[in-house]
């Protein structure tokens, strides 16, 4: 639905039967969103008309984290619950490339695919990780993989200069954005008794890197010296 911010009246409403589950992206007066059957839709923001839809493979078991959308210029990149990533050319309305994330965690094989939000830098390189066991750097234009490293998370990745910041459980990692090498890797313990530390988000400002945990704790890491923490 679209609602007017002036009078809160409904401008238009579109029902397509299957619930939408992904994040929403808006590009050139069109909305892009994925439903729980791994089908992506393009909807006109002005009148709610359906421009087109594109269906991909879908599994019975799924999670909302399976479906992530990002846009770079006129390239629409998205993941689905089948462990795939697609790039659609929004001008030609066709598949530019697609990749399959192979499950690499053999000891505890995840049944449901979960992905981080897709992050794209100014040069057109996307970064994504998943519970399938790897973090990837991929060129948006061609789909070629710059590097893949055996690190897993479903928390949002952060780009800071030539570094990628990652959190997984109680661990904070810094990866070289160009090479995929690990620059910093440290686990933290809770200051609270009988409490386990699990990071859930990162905030970055001039004063430092804030690692926010599930138990309301926050660890501050110095931007210039990662070993300097509070």
Please report, for each region that a protein language model flagged, where it lies by residue:
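Flexible, glycine-rich surface segments
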Residues: 128, 136, 149-159, 165-177, ...
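Structural signature of WD-repeat beta-propellers
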Residues: 28, 35-36, 73, 80-81, ...
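Short loop/turn segments that connect beta-strands within beta-propeller blades
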Residues: 4-8, 44-48, 89-93, 139-143, ...
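WD40 beta-propeller blade core
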Residues: 1, 41, 86, 95, ...
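C-terminal closing repeat unit and adjoining cap/tail of repeat-based domains
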Residues: 142, 207-208, 213-230
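Beta-propeller domains
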Residues: 81, 121-123, 128-136, 140-146, ...
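Extracytoplasmic beta-rich repeat domains
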Residues: 9-28, 49-73, 94-122, 144-161, ...
